[in-house]
Amino acid sequence: IQINDSFFKENLDLYKYAQSDIDKNKAFNQCMTFIKTLDNVIEKNNGFILSKTLSLADYAIFPFIRQFVNVDQNKFKDTNQKNIEDWYSIIHESSEFKYIMKKPNLS
């Protein structure tokens, strides 16, 4: 979580708000350093960050990975990070995620 909240978050912001394609690609590549490490951790731990089941660590990091993926979904898919893709889908499609992302009825 510490690496996510420092190195990854800093580069994620640079990637999201880059002023040039060169800056955006550089920030993307920096983010991919963390993404590849996370992909390996997820593989090692059988599908999630700490173990075989969802934990607070997964929920803490997911919003940042979601932001990264949403900048350019096709570019992310081209990286072939299968473990992260599966992990992402499980959380994104979960009833918990859908519940917290439900827009409130303000009328």
Where are the regions that the model predicts?
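Long, charge-rich low-complexity segments
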Residues: K103-S107
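Extracellular ligand-binding/catalytic regions of CAZymes and related secreted enzymes
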Residues: N83, I100-M101
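GST-like fold's C-terminal all-alpha helical module
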Residues: Q2-E93
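Long, amphipathic alpha-helical surface segments
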Residues: H92-S95, I100
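Short, flexible helix/strand-to-coil boundary loops that buttress conserved ligand/catalytic motifs
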Residues: D72, M101-K102
